[in-house]
Amino acid sequence: MGNHFDKVRLKKVEIILGPTGVGKTEFAIKKALEYGSPVISCDSRQIFKEMTIGTAVPDASQLAAVKHYFIHSNSVGEDYTAGRYEIEAHRLVKELLEMGHERLVMCGGSGFYIDAFVNGLDDFPPADQKLRAELTARLREEGVGALAEELRALDPESCEVIDLSNGQRVLRALEVCLMTGRKFSSFKTSPKRSHDFRIEKIGLMRPKEKLYSRIDARVLKMIDEGLVEEVRGLIPLRDRPALQTVGYKEIFAWFDYLDGKVSTEGWGPTSPGDGPVTTLERAIELIQRNSRRYAKRQLSYWRRDKSIVWVENI
């Protein structure tokens, strides 16, 4: 029994993380091919099958080259949480290691999902559907800024790490605070989970100017690939929290303007002073800006984690 445990302990999960646009997908596929491993995604948006272009899902050739898990595995209509990901990802890793894999590659930019996998989570309460419907209605009518201010009053610590332009994140944090009377941050991950395998985190980075240039170019590529049409097809689902995110909310705001629904917040850029999104060009500018801001927040979140080995991905 001890020998079996020692052998399992030699196995490793390598987590490739980093800001949006840094090149995680290509790096992870290269590692996976080297190890003979699949890629386990830890991206909270790529998990939804209706969101392809705006989430930079690996293309057909990349998906054909290496088996991927947690890509397009669920619907935007589902309430998918980090707690559920923790359970399902651990179950998958256990199965893959028992199949004989010595090294596994995990890849993504969702810090909360990564923390859930590595450290575990306290038991979050299940969603209260009535409260969620009320908050979703407020999100649409008042904008994410109003919900973020309420969250700040209840849990300022969470506001330091949550992407306050992401309606899904803000709504869930506020929902937990209102349901439990506890701060959402009090449910955060803590280093308590033990593993029968080693974990190594590799953080990818690039010089800021190069990273931002890549982000801007990638947004233009998304537009060329049909992002506007993808978002148009999601209008019936636009109330879903998963769609209150960069790349989708800005185009929804443009659609609203075209339909005569002028709004400066909510479905739009969510930053004071942005004004209505009157053109596609303005929507593109805001997606680029909000993506750069998101990359900056991701890096700030991970700089506190001293276990990450940072590599310049040139």
Specify the residue positions occupied by each region the protein language model found:
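Phosphate/pyrophosphate-binding catalytic cores of soluble transferases and nucleic-acid-acting enzymes
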Residues: 1-314
